C-alpha cells in the first residue's frame, strides 16, 4: 500500500508539471530511450503539436505631410507638418502550425500563414478637403480619388484611394528548436528553448499596376528571412511567467520582389530588420490536475523595434500609382543617373522608413480540455511610435580620388551628391524624400482578435 501511494503521488506530480498552456512551455520532446521509473515520463511526452490560428487585424493611422511653403511658420521652429490622409486596413489570416519532436527535446516546426482577405483605404483626414490635400496638390492622386476595385468610378464620400482586395500566402515558416532545459524533465529548472526559423517567400509578390489594378492580389514581400529566437518559462504553483526574445533579418529576395538593389548611390535598400521581446504571466483560474482540465488568464505585452530600411507603408500603392513610368506622374524614377536624359522606370511603391517602435498589450484566456486539446482566445491592442515613411537619401558622397585611384571616388572635392554621377540614388525622389516634402505616419493604433485550437500528442 505505501508503494502504491508513492507511485500515485509521483504520477500526480508528473501530470501537474506537464499541465502547461502557453507556447513557451511546450516542448515536443521526440523519442527518448527510457526504462523503469522513466517509462511514465516517456508516455507523457509531448511529441506532436498541431494547431490552427485565426486572427483579425484592424489598423489605423494618420498621414501627415511636411511643408516648406508655410510662410507663417517660425523660421527657427520645428518644420511645419499638416494633416493629410487617414489610413485603415483590415486583414483576416488563418495559420496552420505543426511542431514535431525529433529526439530528446529537439523539434521541427512549420507554419503557413494564409491571408484570407486584406483590404485597405485612404480617406481625407479631419479638416482636409480634396483640393487642399497635399497629395492631390503634388499630383500623386487626382482630386476625385482612385478606386482600384472600380477604376472607372471615383470613390464616394471622403475616400481618396481604395486598394484592391488581396489574399494569398507570403511565406512558409520552417524551423528547428532545442530545449537545453525542460521543466517537464526537471521541475527545479525552467523551460529554456532556442530556435531558428527560415521564412521562405513562396506567394505572389504584392505589387500595384494602375493600368490593371485587379491583376495582382498578392500579399508576399518576396523576401526570404531568418528568425532567431529564445524563450524562458517557469511554472510556480498557480502562476507561470514567460518571455520570448527574437531577431528577424532579410537574407535574399525572389527575382520579382520589389526589394531590388539598383546600384549607384542607393543605400538601405533591404527590407527592414526587426527585433523584439514578448512576455506574459499566466495565472490559473481553474486547475483540475486529475482530469487535466485547466483555465488560465495570460496577461502580457510585446515590444518590437523596426529598424530603418525599405518596406510597404500605408502609402505604397499611392506611390506606385504616381510613379507609373507609362504615365506622367511625379514619382517616375531615372534608373541610370549617369546616362543623358531620363531612363524612365516605375517607382516600386515601397519606400525607406524611419526606425520606430511597436508596442502591444496582450490578454488571452487559455483552456485545456484533457491532455490533448487546448483552446486560446486572445485580444491585442497595438501602438506604433510616429515615424517618417519617405526617407530615402539623395545618394552617397564619394571620397576624393587619391593618386592613381579611378574607381569608388570623385574627382571634385566637395560634400554633396553630384547630379549625373554614380553618387546619385536612383530610388530618391525629391518630391517625397526631401525635407519639407516627406510623409509621416502618426497616431498608429491597432486591434488584433484571435482564436487558436491545438491538438497535442
What are the residue ranges of the model-derived segments?
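Outer membrane beta-barrel transmembrane domains
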Residues: 69-70, 253-457
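Outer-membrane pore/translocation modules
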Residues: 117-270, 400-413, 418, 423-437, ...
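Gram-negative outer-membrane beta-barrel proteins
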Residues: 56-64, 116-122, 182-184, 200-208, ...
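Residues on the lipid-exposed face of transmembrane beta-strands in outer-membrane beta-barrel proteins
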Residues: 54, 96-102, 110, 174-180, ...
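Cleavable N-terminal export/targeting peptides
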Residues: 1-32, 416-426, 457
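Transmembrane beta-barrel strands of outer-membrane/channel proteins
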Residues: 48-58, 110-114, 192-200, 243-249, ...
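Surface-exposed strand-loop-strand hairpins of Gram-negative outer-membrane beta-barrel proteins
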Residues: 24-26, 54-93, 123, 209, ...
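Short loop/turn motifs that connect adjacent beta-strands in outer-membrane beta-barrel proteins
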Residues: 22-23, 35-48, 105, 121, ...
Amino acid at each position: 500500500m505505501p508503494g502504491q501511494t508513492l507511485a500515485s503521488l509521483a504520477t500526480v506530480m508528473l501530470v501537474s508539471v506537464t499541465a502547461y498552456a502557453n507556447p513557451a512551455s511546450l516542448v515536443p520532446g521526440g523519442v527518448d530511450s527510457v526504462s523503469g521509473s522513466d517509462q511514465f515520463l516517456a508516455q507523457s511526452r509531448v511529441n506532436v503539436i498541431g494547431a490552427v490560428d485565426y486572427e483579425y487585424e484592424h489598423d489605423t493611422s494618420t498621414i501627415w505631410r511636411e511643408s516648406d511653403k508655410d510662410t507663417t511658420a517660425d523660421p527657427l521652429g520645428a518644420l511645419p507638418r499638416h494633416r493629410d490622409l487617414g489610413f485603415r486596413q483590415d486583414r483576416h489570416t488563418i495559420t496552420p502550425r505543426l511542431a514535431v519532436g525529433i529526439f530528446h527535446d529537439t523539434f521541427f516546426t512549420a507554419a503557413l500563414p494564409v491571408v484570407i482577405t486584406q483590404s485597405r483605404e485612404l480617406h481625407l483626414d479631419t479638416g482636409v478637403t480634396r483640393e487642399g490635400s497635399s497629395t492631390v496638390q503634388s499630383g500623386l492622386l487626382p482630386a476625385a480619388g482612385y478606386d482600384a476595385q472600380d477604376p472607372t468610378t471615383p470613390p464616394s464620400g471622403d475616400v481618396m484611394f481604395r486598394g484592391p482586395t488581396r489574399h494569398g500566402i507570403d511565406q512558409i515558416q520552417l524551423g528547428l528548436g532545442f530545449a537545453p532545459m525542460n521543466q517537464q524533465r526537471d521541475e527545479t529548472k525552467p523551460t529554456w528553448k532556442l530556435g531558428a526559423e527560415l521564412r521562405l517567400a513562396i506567394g505572389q509578390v504584392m505589387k500595384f499596376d494602375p493600368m490593371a489594378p485587379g491583376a495582382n492580389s498578392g500579399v508576399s514581400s518576396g523576401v526570404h528571412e531568418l528568425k532567431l529566437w529564445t524563450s524562458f518559462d517557469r511554472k510556480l504553483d498557480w502562476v507561470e511567467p514567460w518571455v520570448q526574445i527574437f531577431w528577424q533579418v532579410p537574407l535574399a529576395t525572389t527575382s520579382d520582389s520589389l526589394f531590388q538593389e539598383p546600384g549607384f548611390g542607393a543605400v538601405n535598400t533591404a527590407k527592414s530588420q526587426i527585433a523584439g521581446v514578448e512576455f506574459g504571466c499566466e495565472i490559473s483560474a481553474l486547475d483540475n490536475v486529475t482530469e487535466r482540465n485547466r483555465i488560465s488568464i495570460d496577461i502580457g505585452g510585446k515590444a518590437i523595434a523596426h529598424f530603418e530600411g525599405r518596406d510597404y507603408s500605408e502609402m505604397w500603392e499611392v506611390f506606385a500609382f504616381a510613379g507609373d513610368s507609362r504615365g506622367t506622374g511625379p514619382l517616375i524614377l531615372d534608373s541610370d543617373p549617369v546616362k543623358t536624359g531620363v531612363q524612365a522606370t516605375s517607382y516600386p511603391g515601397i519606400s525607406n522608413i524611419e526606425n520606430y517602435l511597436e508596442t502591444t498589450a496582450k490578454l488571452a484566456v487559455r483552456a485545456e480540455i484533457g491532455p490533448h486539446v487546448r483552446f486560446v482566445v486572445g485580444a491585442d491592442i497595438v501602438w506604433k511610435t510616429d515615424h517618417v515613411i519617405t526617407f530615402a537619401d539623395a545618394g552617397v558622397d564619394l571620397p576624393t580620388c587619391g593618386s592613381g585611384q579611378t574607381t569608388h571616388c570623385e574627382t571634385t572635392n566637395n560634400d554633396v551628391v553630384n547630379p549625373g554621377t554614380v553618387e546619385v540614388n536612383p530610388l530618391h525622389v525629391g518630391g517625397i524624400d526631401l525635407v519639407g516634402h516627406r510623409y509621416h505616419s502618426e497616431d498608429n493604433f491597432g486591434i488584433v482578435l484571435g482564436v487558436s485550437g491545438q491538438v497535442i500528442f
